[in-house]
Amino acid sequence: EYALQLAEEACAAGVDEVQFDYVRYPDADHSVLVFDGGSTEQTRVATITGFLAEAKERVGPRCQTAADIFGFVTSVSNDGGIGHQVEALAEVTDVLSPMVYPNHWGPGWFGYTSPEDHPGGVIDQSMRNVLERTAGRTTIRPWLQDFGGYGPAEVRAQIDAADSLGLGWMLWNAGSVFTEGGIPLADEVSTPSQVPPPVEETRPPSGFWDVPAANGYGQAI
């Protein structure tokens, strides 16, 4: 309720979008956690989408309702144990921002031994997955990696991958120190259109598509 009241206050003050961060269940072993009503995929998804649906009702049409989601849920069919089910989230948000930082993906994702070494490929494939699954029901605007040793080339590769799919983007650096050489000028990027090229088959290698709760970005199961 407190978060919803803050969102309403921000919208009344003229903010045009409220992005809810870390709206999820703990990414931990649920066998040692206790929740009112239990913790099944159905209850988790219902809880998270229920909160966002109420937020959208209370702040709209003054504000857009946005949510950060874990990046790996773009490419798994379940909720990842945290209540993030992409198709359901698309119905209750105006904007979804997957945190698809390449250094968060384990060996084997998208066919890469080291996904961190393929920043453009990780963004391209994960975004194609989420665009196919949401089918225009919400705007996709990913968080991209500007930390962990990435320089201008790696940052720009991610931006170019998002831009090529008609997507806007945001950069994350915990200290708000950004790689200036990797950020394009305004006339070097497209106006977001979210009209991507035909989606190609990008399912992860065998063993990844149905990720058990709390496994997340980990190695092959």
Give the positions of each predicted feature.
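Substrate-binding cleft of secreted/luminal carbohydrate-active enzymes
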Residues: 93-107, 116-207, 212
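Active-site-adjacent "subsite" loops/lids of carbohydrate-active enzymes
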Residues: 1-9
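Generic structural signal for well-ordered alpha-helices
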Residues: 7-8, 45-56, 86, 123-131, ...
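Aromatic- and acidic-residue-enriched carbohydrate-binding clefts of CAZyme catalytic domains
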Residues: 26-43
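Alpha-helix N-cap and loop-to-helix initiation/capping positions
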Residues: 2, 39-47, 80-84, 114-122, ...
